[in-house]
């Protein structure tokens, strides 16, 4: 179709994405990952009510259920989603599950009762959500599981290339610590697809290095929990050489534990998501690297997807993907290139200044005035 559709066609060949939706309503929050609007699509089945085009007499209403609304990634996602809501004239209701799966179920059920046009959710437990996603489908409401694959016909997962990216991070870390020693992994929670894939990728990368031991702790995506986990791991493992956290907000907290322990420069810190503070930490040398997913871009893109679903457009691809970029200083980029890690020949590696520019330009990149023109 138009520019956004063409862009997504290219992006779906690249990596992974998550999801989000726009403006208005009670609490601001965020979500997971996203590229440009979905690829060429087909009309929704007649049995599914299709919402009105954005800006029409009946404004499209999207309901979004986030894991929480305090993590900086989610905060930025909300901002991006609200910008899309402004651009396309839709309404978005943001709700937080506060890290509680039962809350997440209840919030989705409330959106079904309200009769919103599309529901987006960042699943705490993808498999556990299937019954309520099926309930939404039966009510004629399309859904987007951001970073979660739920096998329901009218559900569209949005994901990043998390497993492969984190495998590369693990191998880079292994090379930097001399292929021996002890590293720590701070993950989110079991059952969350993003957390599970990033955890799986890290172990896949470390499998090649039998002289490296990985210790781990869950964080539930919560920075204070992440700081405590890092403190405990550093205390229990004085020979720790590296820490990888699967979300920047948690990594920034964990870095404070490294600093307090007097281990700056001794413990390599790597991260994921690419929020502004993390990009500054890469520039200053506090972090060795992060991965730019672009939370604001993710939020904006997911709104576009939700608007198309609500208006009866179905993406050609069942699982939607968003591009990502490794972020490191030019000096570390040169070292990374010399490591010869398998699968990195075509990986995008940019410096923090380039990442900030990309992150700020998401609206110009994605906005399509003909998004719903058919």
Where are the language model's segments positioned?
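Sec-dependent signal peptide recognition
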Residues: 2-10
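Hydrophobic core
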Residues: 9, 13-17
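A residue-level marker of the well-folded mature domains of exported/periplasmic proteins
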Residues: 13, 21-374
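Hydrophobic membrane-targeting alpha-helices
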Residues: 4, 16-21
């Amino acid at each position: 179709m138009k520019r956004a559709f063409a862009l997504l066609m290219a992006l779906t060949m690249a990596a992974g994405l998550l999801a989000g939706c726009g403006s208005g309503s009670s609490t601001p929050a965020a979500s997971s990952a996203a590229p440009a609007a979905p690829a060429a699509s087909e009309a929704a089945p007649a049995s599914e009510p299709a919402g009105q085009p954005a800006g029409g007499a009946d404004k499209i209403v999207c309901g979004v259920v986030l894991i929480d609304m305090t993590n900086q990634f989610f905060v930025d996602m909300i901002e991006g989603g609200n910008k899309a809501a402004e651009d396309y004239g839709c309404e978005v209701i943001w709700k937080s599950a506060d890290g509680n799966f039962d809350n997440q179920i209840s919030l989705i059920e409330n959106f079904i009762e309200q009769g919103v046009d599309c529901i987006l959710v960042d699943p705490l437990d993808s498999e556990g959500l299937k019954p309520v996603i099926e309930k939404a489908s039966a009510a004629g409401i399309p859904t987007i599981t951001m970073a979660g694959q739920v096998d329901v016909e009218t559900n569209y997962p949005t994901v990043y290339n998390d497993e492969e990216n984190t495998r590369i991070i693990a191998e880079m870390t292994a090379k930097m610590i001399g292929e021996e020693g002890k590293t720590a992994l701070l993950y989110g929670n079991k059952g969350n697809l993003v957390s599970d894939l990033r955890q799986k990728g890290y172990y896949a990368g470390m499998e090649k290095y039998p002289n490296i031991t990985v210790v781990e702790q869950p964080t539930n995506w919560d920075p204070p929990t992440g700081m405590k986990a890092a403190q405990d791991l550093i205390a229990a493992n004085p020979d720790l050489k590296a820490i990888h956290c699967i979300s920047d907000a948690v990594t920034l907290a964990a870095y404070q534990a490294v600093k307090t322990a007097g281990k700056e420069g001794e413990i390599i810190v790597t991260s994921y998501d690419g929020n502004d503070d993390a990009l500054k930490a890469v520039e200053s040398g506090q972090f060795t690297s992060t991965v730019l997913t672009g939370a604001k871009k993710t939020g904006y893109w997911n709104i576009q997807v939700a608007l198309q679903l609500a208006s009866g457009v179905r993406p050609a691809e069942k699982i939607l993907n968003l591009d990502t970029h490794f972020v490191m200083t030019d000096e570390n980029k040169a070292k990374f290139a010399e490591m010869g890690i398998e699968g990195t020949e075509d990986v995008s590696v940019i410096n923090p200044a380039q990442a900030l520019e990309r992150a700020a330009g998401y609206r110009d990149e994605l906005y399509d005035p003909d998004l719903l023109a058919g």
